[in-house]
């Protein structure tokens, strides 16, 4: 895929032929020279119960030495590639990725350096559909992770069942108006809480959100 180009996979059957859009998840990723982007994609696919129901919209800000060749021809992928020097920031990059949305029922907005839990796709859909209201949205600041000597993902906390869910808090409002969003490991809960914040490194909701509240 040349710099400045857009690719949609053409080999094989398109996802809509094997999976109804009413069950699909559109995974939107903005990546800026992130060496973990291929890992993030592989993790999403390998840990999903239904990888055939995933589609990806990626704004890939890269140099000529970076490659996503093994994904370019996959019909689940829609990729816009830009020279990293031409980047206009993360808001612009997320907007570019979301412009590749094509009517999938669900939308996951995720960082390009993310690790996925087994069965994440069915789990997120069940959590979302169990919430009241016409337009529920799940969001948090995703926990950091590292790798052990064998290359396995190591998380600082295990998740809902073992440790509870760390709360997203705002400890500081900076002079320029920025909110300093942090995760509180001391305050953990066993169920979802309402929050005044959205953290764009993890948002899961219905796909209509892209059209109702587009990134700019």
Where are these predicted regions, by residue range?
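Catalytic cores of eukaryotic secretory-pathway lumenal/extracellular enzymes that build
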Residues: 9-216
């Amino acid at each position: 895929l040349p710099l400045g180009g857009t690719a949609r996979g053409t080999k094989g059957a398109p996802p809509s032929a094997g999976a109804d859009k009413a069950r699909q998840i559109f995974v939107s990723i903005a990546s800026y020279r992130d060496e973990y982007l291929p890992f993030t994609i592989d993790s999403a696919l390998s840990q999903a119960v239904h990888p055939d129901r995933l589609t990806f919209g990626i704004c890939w800000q890269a140099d000529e030495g970076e490659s996503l060749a093994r994904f370019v021809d996959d019909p689940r992928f829609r990729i816009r590639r830009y020279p990293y020097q031409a980047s206009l920031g993360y808001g612009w990059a997320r907007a570019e990725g979301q412009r590749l949305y094509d009517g999938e029922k669900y939308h996951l907005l995720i960082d390009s350096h993310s690790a996925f839990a087994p069965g994440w796709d069915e789990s997120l859909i069940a959590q979302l559909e169990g919430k009241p209201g016409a337009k529920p949205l799940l969001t948090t600041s995703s926990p950091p992770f590292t790798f052990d000597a064998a290359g396995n993902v190591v998380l600082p906390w295990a998740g809902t069942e073992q440790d509870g869910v760390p709360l997203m808090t705002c400890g500081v409002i900076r002079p320029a108006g920025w909110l300093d969003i942090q995760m509180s490991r001391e305050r953990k809960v066993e169920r979802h809480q309402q929050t005044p914040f959205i953290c764009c490194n993890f948002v899961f909701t219905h796909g209509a959100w892209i059209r109702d509240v587009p990134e700019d």
